């Protein structure tokens, strides 16, 4: 609570490559917003994700626009360009620094997949990150939230720095969506309708000259 009893604004931060954004991302963000009483969830598409340099990543502007399309119908969802406009490799520490500067009085909650937490102590400036935001680890299909690698990471973190929750188990991944698009298989109901249409219009995830069937 802020001085005078006024409740602090609670801001969720969902960073990701979003290549493409899919319904699993949206369900996870909605579930976290409900459970933690968030006022807003800001989606932050990465510029150049440092951990995915081994594969080609769709252009940042395309990923940004797909995220805008996907989140437009939910009044609690917004999209930020901080990682894209910064340039260079994207690190979570920079995302949180920028959003803290833009929202100095808000409580920040960083939303990530539970599987990413196994290596969280190797992230750049992880101590600083936990001083800026609380972390919410959400389950992904086939992943055990109480795995020993997660427990080991949590043992090194400050109290109340990290929460683990389960979300409806939608077996959707961006990788599968890309593969289906490459093979001209439908991606309806895996991603929002507007994203299906954007992928087809921009001929994403296909070799040059090959059409895409939504």
Curated annotation (Swiss-Prot):
Pathway assigned to this chain's UniProt record: Cofactor biosynthesis; NAD(+) biosynthesis; deamido-NAD(+) from nicotinate D-ribonucleotide: step 1/1
Protein keywords: ATP-binding, NAD, Nucleotide-binding, Nucleotidyltransferase, Pyridine nucleotide biosynthesis, Transferase
Domain of life: Bacteria
Database matches in Gene3D superfamilies: HUPs (3.40.50.620)
Reactions the enzyme catalyzes: nicotinate beta-D-ribonucleotide + ATP + H(+) = deamido-NAD(+) + diphosphate
KW Nucleotide-binding (keyword) present: yes
Entry similarity comment: Belongs to the NadD family.
Name under which the protein is recorded: Probable nicotinate-nucleotide adenylyltransferase
Species classification: Bacteria, Bacillati, Actinomycetota, Actinomycetes, Mycobacteriales
Gene responsible for this protein: nadD
């Amino acid at each position: 609570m802020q001085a005078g009893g006024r409740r602090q604004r609670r801001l969720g931060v969902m960073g990701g490559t979003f290549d493409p954004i899919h319904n699993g991302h949206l369900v996870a963000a909605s579930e976290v917003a409900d459970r933690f009483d968030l006022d807003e969830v800001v989606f932050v598409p990465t510029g150049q994700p440092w951990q995915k340099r081994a594969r080609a990543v769709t252009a940042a502007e395309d990923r940004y626009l797909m995220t805008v399309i996907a989140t437009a119908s939910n009044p609690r969802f917004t999209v930020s360009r901080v990682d894209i406009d910064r340039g260079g490799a994207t690190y979570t520490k920079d995302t949180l620094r920028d959003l803290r500067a833009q929202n100095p009085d808000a409580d920040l909650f960083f939303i990530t997949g539970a599987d990413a937490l196994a290596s969280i102590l190797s992230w750049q400036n992880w101590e600083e990150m936990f001083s800026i935001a609380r972390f919410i680890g959400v389950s992904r299909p086939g992943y055990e939230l109480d795995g020993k690698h997660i427990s080991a990471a949590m043992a090194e973190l400050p109290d109340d720095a990290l929460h683990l929750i389960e979300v409806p188990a939608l077996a959707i991944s961006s990788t599968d969506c890309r593969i289906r698009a490459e093979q001209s298989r439908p991606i309806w109901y895996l991603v929002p309708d507007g994203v299906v249409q954007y992928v087809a219009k921009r001929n994403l995830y296909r070799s040059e000259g090959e059409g895409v069937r939504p």
